[in-house]
Amino acid sequence: MDTFKRWLNKPKADDKSLLARFFHADRSLTAVASELDSFDGRAEPDRCTRLVSRLRQNQDKVLAITNLIMEELLGEDRDPRAFRAKFPEEVLQENLAGQLWFGAECLAAGSSIMNRETESKEMRPLAQAVTKSLGNVRVLLRDQCLKNNVPNSKTLHLDLNDSTTEQLYESLKIFDRLFAEFELSYVSAMVQVKSRHEYEMQQWIGVLFSETLQRALKIGLLDQEMVDAFDPGLMFSIPRLAIVAGLVVYAKGPLNMDMPGDQLSEMFRPFRTILIKIRDLLRNLNNQELYQLEKLLCTNEDINTKVPLGSSSIEAPSPEHSAHPTTSSSQNNNNSSNNNHSSSSTTTTTMGTTNTHRTVERLVDQRNNNHNSNSNSSTNPTVEGATLRSPSMLSLSATSTPTASPAPSPTPSHSIDSTSSAATSSTNPPADWSDGDDEDEDDDDIEVDEEDLESSDDDTDEEQLLKDIVAADCASGYLIPNTNLGNLLQPQEVPLTDNFVASEDDEYGTAEQQGHQGLEEEEPSTSAAMLAATRTLQRLRLPSSDTEPLAEPTTIKATEEQMQQPNGRHQESHSHSHRHHQRHHHHHHHRHSHQHRQPHPHRTTRSGRKRCSLEVADPETIQPEREQNLASGDTSAASSLSDDVSLAMRNTTARLKFKSTENLLHRLFVCIAGVADQLQTNFASDLRQILRSVFLMNMSSAQEEIDIPEKTKESELFEFRASENDVIQESAGSNQSIYSAEEVNPELDNVFSAGGGNQATGQRHSAGASMQRNNTIDLASQSGEGSPSGATMSTSRSHVTRSRSLGDQEAASSATSSTAQLRQQEQQQQLQIQLQRQRNNSVGSNTPSSASSTSSSSEQNSPVSARSGSRRRLQSNNETQMPSSATSTSATLSPPAWIPDGKAPRCMACQTPFTAFRRRHHCRNCGGVFCGVCSNASAPLPKYGLTKAVRVCRDCYVREVRSGMGVQGVQRVQSVQASAS
């Protein structure tokens, strides 16, 4: 009996209820599965392939209907699937459920995923549980189809008191949970799924992109219209700009290259090495160079070499400082065999800055391995007893010692603004390094002559040590060329440096800094290394020696006058070598014979880094202080500053490899664009998702609907001014500007009488709102036949309205009917005859009409008088004659005002949105806004005084222009042309 009821309740084929649809889909799936089991697939591969395709389609269909049933029965009790947010877009397809079911059956049968044997073994128990649970759900749903199906019902009608219904409910919950777990495991094994950290890093990348876009909008690199229009070019510009901003502007953000590689976002992890190199080069750019690079990344235009770069830009070294890489090894061998000294004693001129320039130039030669070319450019080589103000000199080579190993990048507050230090060595005025009381003893402090240097040539180890000394060894103080630097003269509590891009307002630097640096650079041929040293050390922050109680804080006491004051004595710089024995793990302090009279001590650290002090101390306290410093350990501040200088050395050395700033910017553009463009290929899904979020966050509010008025109001006319070129070219340098041109508007003619005298007072009337400017001409009309001087005159005022240019009117006007046009033309002809009579009768009289004719004659030079040119020529020619007939004058109407561009974001014909490439075009006949395709027609408009062909839309061309160009239109145009000739 129960079987008979089931047969009677079997769903029909046309039943659209959920249970009926599941019943038929399940039967079809069972039939395909039975057919697959009935033959050997290896014997008939084609048939097997077709059946497998049908099987997967039926599985998709069954699971889709099952999902709908679970949505209705379980509702909020369904297992969450928030993990799908981490899946790539190409994985989230409609047939994902069918693929998962097919994969679960394969794994349950003993198969393994290719190259995923370990994951397959781990997922096999879960796959077996999924297939078993799904089989149980299918059986229970088939039973419900035969018992509780309501034909064509949109909802399920199950018996809640039945045990099978409760069993179905629990089975669906179990299957939903197992299937969700299997989905996450299977997809994670097949494709790379982001972890929680990686997903958060991708969100931070999105924040970086958004901040980059807002910064680009603020400094004018991009336009808001491009964001609102979803300009495709932004898909390339934003990632490029984000790389620059992430490496320099937001150095502690998601593109912080100092963090471990596994903590970087997977999008930029493959490019970590090249990004570090890009970051080092970007830190050598000043603000203007950085702006040029960002503009180049946005527009792909050529670098504008005519625009002067910032004052901190480094030029290529002079040819005398350049070295050929192929000869470096041979030069090193020659230097070691000939025992040539790496740095020689140089007697400089009286100016300390000249000493500095040549010293650093010699260091550049040393970096380029030009040891054979010693700097002998001193002006007085035989001067004896010169004072040595800075006996310590640092090598330029950043790769010769272990101290130049890659160091963590400084924080943004200690970052390097424009260029990094190449070398530090100088001879400065006495106020820098000694007290005023000891100035008389400076000549006897240290005596250096050529014999001292010749004696040192015998020591090969000392020569090697001179090559190995780097600028990073100087930790507590610097010997800085051109110490007349504003930042170094500030107190220690004042920061010496800002962020790389502290603010967009300080984009190009101040003119005072550039002028100050120009005064400092007295020698024209200043080397690039000297500029690098000066500007980098100007940015570096000297660490406070709080951890050293016996060492007073480092200070520099000097004034600007002392910095720029000539020494008066010739100075010599002598290299002071330090010996570093790594094998015995101790340090030997190589001292000069006269070193006890040096005004600054040397301190040796445990790590082998030498530290130079800028302290001004008495000679009696130098020796105990040196001993105390030798006993004290190294501090973290010294190590940090040593890393800063080491990083500065590497950065400047890398920049000096480029021939020019343009070459550096071009190389950076190629590298940055290459990385950003590879993101489009390797991480297309993630990049699209990030850019979509960025666009939605930064787009402006929804624009208002287009409000096109049905009838033009004269108060809504816009004022448009002609360009300067139009005034210059067409006015031919006339003193009468284009704004003096006037045109009569018959639609606004309101004639009214005013009490007269011998002369009517002229008044000017301006009708309209703030966006319109109307010019009026006061006209005097005689009453009767009396003379203009004796008879009473009635002054009539006609409003004269003229648009400021032929192509810039913005409001919409509906075309008037043919009868209204004829009536207006007749009125205008009558008014024209009356005006001409008045002007002929008032020739030579002192009336407003003469002023009117004067203004009209001056208007002939206006470039926009083409509409009423024939009428104005008739007025000037017929100054003493009456026109023969009224038909010889052409009646012109006021052209329609144009719709503003802001109120027309789409074409009014095809509704296509306007973009940066799809421009707006206005129809001269109706004033509407159209694209170039919908307004490609052109025709003359005699009714507006436009005898030449102008742009009109297609509708106006078909409906009005062609229909209106009948016999009257042709005769009107011919008459206008004849009168003009």
From Swiss-Prot:
Residues 434-462 have a biased composition (Acidic residues). Residues 308-462, 561-642, 749-897 are annotated as: Disordered. Residues 576-611 have a biased composition (Basic residues). Negative regulator of epidermal growth factor receptor (EGFR) signaling. GO terms for cellular component: early endosome membrane. SMART domains: FYVE (SM00064). SUPFAM superfamilies: FYVE/PHD zinc finger. Pfam families: FYVE. Zn(2+) 2 binds at residues 923, 926, 953, 956. GO terms for molecular function: zinc ion binding. InterPro entries: FYVE_LST2, LST-2, Znf_FYVE, Znf_FYVE-rel, Znf_FYVE_PHD, Znf_RING/FYVE/PHD. The lineage of its organism: Eukaryota, Metazoa, Ecdysozoa, Arthropoda, Hexapoda. Gene3D superfamilies: Zinc/RING finger domain, C3HC4 (zinc finger). Disulfide bonds: none annotated. Zn(2+) 1 binds at residues 907, 910, 931, 934. Residues 326-356, 369-380, 390-404, 412-433, 630-642, 811-866, 883-896 have a biased composition (Low complexity). Residues 760-791 have a biased composition (Polar residues). This is Lateral signaling target protein 2 homolog.
